[in-house]
Amino acid sequence: MALRSISFNQDYTCLAAGFDAAYKVYNCDPFGECFQKADDGGANLVEMLFSTSLIAVVGIGDKPANTMRKLKIINTKRKAVICELTFPTAILYVKMNRKRLVVVLVDQIFVYDVSCMKLLHSIEASAGLDDRIICDLCADDESVLVFQQSGSSDELAANAGTVVVFDALQIQPINVIECHRSPLQRIAVSKDGRLLATASVKGTIVRVFRVADGRKVHEFRRGSYTAQISCLSFNVDATVLCCSSNTGTVHFFRLDDVDRRRSTGSIDANIDGSETLPRESSITEEESSEINRLINSQLGGHNGFAKKKSAESLKNFIWSKSKTYLPSQINSILEPKRDYAFIKLTTEVESVVGLVDNNCYVATRAGDFFVYSVQPGQCVLLKHYKIE
């Protein structure tokens, strides 16, 4: 059976998988299948409600009864459908916690009360460049909902990297945060709804914002080359952020107090410290020669490409040297932090990631389930299973 979707539940204790002809739920530790249903077709989306017996399922659209416009709420103990909701267009995402159910279409977001499946609110939205809406819902009852800003085509282009923060419990907006210049690729909100993680379609920089005031508290460099981010996820207490991409690499970034003290909010305090900017400091003879050589190459008879390369070299050289004249506190702000640990899968494949204590679960679209021990540097593979 072909694997169509994979997703962890809210505390990473279970994994839900949708196949062409069935859908299943697996325990993560120890890994093993604990539920399957194959008598009503496959599933394009499967969303769990923690480890309860309720799951939300969207079909693959191979027949009218299994349309992608219908959401089924299923009791896994009785293997029975307890509620069905039908929508005007295909369902793109389903997010759920103990208070709210969020259903995302190409142009609308619907918010329901989980206790009675009553529609509470609908939000007009506009899909991004690839006809999808990026969103997430926090796992706690606070029900913080985050999604990309909508608008006309021109407005979308101008605000492609902007996130709307919405209180789905009280049904009111909280904030609008400008996160990236480029269109969004992936966003995630922490379990308690206090932190927002974002990545753009470039996939090189990952940012973390405080939801309440929109303040950027962390900025990380995932890599130098463009990648498609497939998953951003916080651990349960929001001290570590995980990031996976189609390159087959998983990165782990620290969000602890040591890093917070280096965030942009501490610039003023750090500048008042003992380390100050030098007022008089001449460059070395070697640096002077290198700058002169680069400038002369700019003025020479090179073609356009060579000039562009020289200009880039000049910019990079001056930037790297200028940082040596800045206090380390400033450099820690200007230079995005790197991961403290990473996983390199054997194949370049999209994956979803869940971090529990010092163990990381990685489920791939190729049907593999890995368990790694997370430690500084390259993580150690502990176990490998097949999702089938």
Curated annotation (Swiss-Prot):
Give an example GO cellular component term for this record.
vacuolar membrane
Q: Where in the cell is it found?
A: Cytoplasm; Membrane; Vacuole membrane
- Positions of WD repeats: 179-219, 224-263
Concerning InterPro entries, the annotation shows: PROPPIN, WD40/YVTN_repeat-like_dom_sf, WD40_repeat_dom_sf, WD40_rpt
Protein family according to the UniProt entry? Belongs to the WD repeat PROPPIN family.
Q: What is known of its domains?
A: Contains a beta-propeller domain involved in specific binding to phosphatidylinositol 3,5-bisphosphate (PIP2).
Q: What is this protein called?
A: Autophagy-related protein 21
Gene encoding the protein = ATG21
